[in-house]
Amino acid sequence: MLYVVRAVKERKPFVDEILKQIPDAVVYYDRFGNAMKSYLHVCKNIIAGEPAVLLEDDIILTSNFREKIEAVISQHPDTLINFFSLSKKYLEPHWKKGREYCMNQCEYFPEGFSLRVVEAYENWPLKEKEPTAYDFLVGYAWGNNNPYLVWCPSLVQHREVKSIINPRRSSKRQSVTFEV
């Protein structure tokens, strides 16, 4: 399984924590100073259509992360899976429609999907309005009629830190279902 961590240099200590559980993960440090450009670069040139787990740098992994995530993926290898949920309503695994907001802290891309994300960006109606909103782009690329799986309990926790992309965002974006 390919694991890719998207990161910025300021978050290297967090990346080092992730690498303790996933030592063979590919770490991509943003070279563009542009979240969307970096995201598309990773999708096109690093994942390049392979099945992969894409992680952000500001997360904490559950214990036995790799064992848990690979067990879920083995049951749903052809499905977009999100491993972080902010929902207080759904405390168990559930399906969401494509085109909805898709949290990007940790997600599994099935074979070929990363290239669909790159292609979808060309026709994405929010490209100008939401230049860093790859969380919406992923749902758009997956499509309206394709539900994706949101796994609960969350296998990652969003750290309580300021967003580098948008410092005005709340740092209080943690999952109630995360288990250490």
Which residue ranges define each predicted feature?
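An acidic/histidine-cluster motif and surrounding catalytic segment
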Residues: 1-55, 59-180
